[in-house]
Structures are given as C-alpha cells and as structure tokens.
Amino acid sequence: MSDTAILTLRTMLANLDDAKKYQSLRDVMSTLPAPDLAAVFEDLPPEKLPVLFRLCPKDLAAEIFAELTPETQQDLIDGLTDKELKAVVDDLFVDDATDLVEEMPANVVKRILAQADPATRRMINELLKYPEDSAGGVMTTELMELRPDWTVSQAMAAIRKNGFDKETINNCYVTDRDRTLIGVVSLRALVLSKDPDNELIRDMMDDNVVSVSTTTDQEDVSQMFEKYGYLAIPVVDNEKRLVGIVTIDDAISIMQDEASEDIAKMNAMGPSDKPYFKQSMWELYKNRAPWLLFLMISSTFSSMVIRGYEDALAAVTVLTAYIPMLTDAGGNAGSQSTSTIIRGMAVGDIEPHDLPKILWREFRIAILWGGTLALCNFAKLIFLDGIAPPVAAVVCLTLICTVILSQLIGGLLPVVAEKLNFDPAVMASPLITTIVDTTTLLVYFNIARVLLRI
C-alpha cells in the first residue's frame, strides 16, 4: 500500500502546477508515514517544498521535517514564513531542534532561535554546551520523571498530564528532590499494577539503573543499546543528577554514521554525512583526492624495489608474470585480516591487550591458508603453465610468506593505531595493500636470488 501511495504522490507532484488538486494530495499524504513522505520531499525542487509541506497533516509536519537531510531542511526553511517556522520548531523534540541548529548556517540559526519559544531556546542552548559526539550532544531532555513516594495512580496521572510532550514514556525515571537518578520503572509495570492506589513507586522501581555520563562518547552509547537492548538510556552529570536520555532512534543514527565513516576510511575516502547525490563534484573530489594522492606516492616504493632487482628479472623474465598474482593475494589476505580485526574492535570483542593472541591466531590461519594456496598454485604452474619446478617453488614459497606477512601486518596495524589514538579504520585495505605490495616484492626477489642463484 505504501509503495503505491508514494508512486501516486510522485505522479501528482509532477503535474502539480497543472492539476492544483490539493485535496487529492492531502488524501494521499494522509496514508503515508513520515519517513516515506520525507523521501518524497528529498526528490522535490526547492520551490515546491513549501507547497507540499503546507499540505502535510499537522500532526506529522515536525516528524517529516526531522527526517529530512540538512540541505533539504534549509531549502524548506527558506520558503516558510516566520509563523510556519515557529510552529515547526515548537513541535520538534528538543534533540532534533538542537541537531537542526548545529547543521544550519549562522543566518538560518538566528532565524530559528528567534522563532523558538523561550523554554525551547533555553533547552537548545543547554544541549549545545556538550560536545557533538558525546551522550550530552545527542540526548533529549524531554523525559518522564517520577518521585519515589508517589503511588502508581499519581504516577499515571502525571504521565497522562505531561507524557504527550515527552519523547518516550516507555520507561519513566525516578529521581529524588535533587534530581539524582535512583531508579527506573516501565510503563508496563505501572499499567499492570494490582493496587495502583497504594503501591508506591519506590517499591516497584528497578534501582539497578544503567546510565551514561554526559561526556560518554556517542559510539560507546550506541554499543550499550546493542548490549542491553534498551529503548532509552538515561544520561547523568558528574553529580549523578538526571539531565536527559538517549533514545533508540538516535542510537541507530549514530550506528549508521559510524558505519558510514568507517567504510569511507577503510576505502581511503574522507567521510561525509551527505547522501551521494547531495554532494557536489568538488566535495566528492575533496573526499577522495588526498588519500589517492598519498597512496600513489607511497606506491613508488614498489617501483623502487622492482628497479633494484632489474637484473634478476632480466635473467628469469617469467618471474614478472606472477608479480600481480602475488601482490593481489597478499593485499587480499591483509585486507581480510584487517577488516576482521577492525570489526571486532568496533563491537568490543577485541581489545588492544589482545595483540599477542591476535598475532598467534592470524599466524596459524595464515599457515593453513598459505599452504592451501601454494599447493593449488604449484599444481597449476607445473601442469597447466608448464613452468620449471625451481621457478614454481619460488612463486609458491613467496605466496606462503606473503600470506603470513600480510595477515600479521593486517592484524597488527589496527591495534597499533588504537593504542596511538588513531582511528583503526584508517589502517584498512588501501594502506595495507600498499605496505604488502612492497613487502611481497622484497620477499619474492630475495627468494628468487637464493633458489635460482641469480
């Protein structure tokens, strides 16, 4: 149903200037959830954004706005009146409003804050004090607080009165008079209470609360969601006072951003939080060029090695034919090892102190892999390629050594990077491949000199 409605809406928007069937548009839009409507907005030219936004169901307008990319949000803001902008900002959850302020240029931020009501403006300024990549920077202050001496009936009355403006009421947080976090109670427990008029919150709350500090790194926060399976995690200050919560939707966004950043770094690109088609040619060039330039310069070491062994290649020219196979095998082996280690470090399975165990494990795997590849390759060289056994031995011994060295290097570099406070993702495929290429050539030519006496 959703896909059909989206297609219908796109068709109607293509002929909007001619049809002017606004009521029909409203009817179609009322059947779609906010994320689907936001996807339609992303495809519209800037001049049509305000028209469509004014037709949105009022209860979905802020939610749709929060789903848009910063570029589309700015285009939409430029087309809204101050009154319309105020309605949107006031309906946004405070963490979404803070994200909006962080993403917009100064002139747009000034306009947003001017339209926000004083309470919202105060909460936004409070959240902006925290680092962007910390729990304080991604939390919301719109949460449900209860007191330990309340009865369940009093708590339910408070939720009915104030819960509509809270980001979530699935879990309610119990605080004392100083706002110190002392417990958590679920809405389920409150609803299912058998004696709501007499049962106290302190008697049913869970006082073993998992919380994070305002300075906790956002990646660590997202890992806690994965570990505990929570829908929200409370955030406390240095004095253990409750200041906000991080919700699961923000945790998912953090995971997506961190994964995108790691993928970009693992492929020698600068990370970008913009969709592909929202990036200009210059941005794409800027994200890719520095690493490609560095890798091109670093690959000259391989050229220097080859020039240094020109005599060996001239004596046994067939050695040249197997250089690509050896360097590719080494690069692939190193990349597999690196990717496995980086992934393990990202999810907390691997710590820097595990380095000796990592190297021993990778060495044993490399022996098995290298031996298997060498046996298969030796049979191919002798029976299919008709290569002399001494040359085949050189190639296969190099293959074993290359796989071992590559996997050891691939296991070593991410851990070393972590210890030196570098991002382990930087030590990924392109850089590993460059290092392994040079190492492979040195091993290859030296084995050839020894076995072939050249």
Name what the model sees in each region.
Residues Q154-A157, I435, T439:
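Extended alpha-helical regions
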Residues P50, L441-L442:
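Generic intrinsically disordered, low-complexity segments enriched for polar/acidic and small residues
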Residues N238, D250-A251, A329, P424, ...:
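Generic detector of well-ordered alpha-helical packing
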Residues M1-G270:
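Hydrophobic packing positions in regular secondary-structure scaffolds
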Residues A259-L408, L412-I435, V443-I454:
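Alpha-helical transmembrane segments and their membrane-interface boundaries
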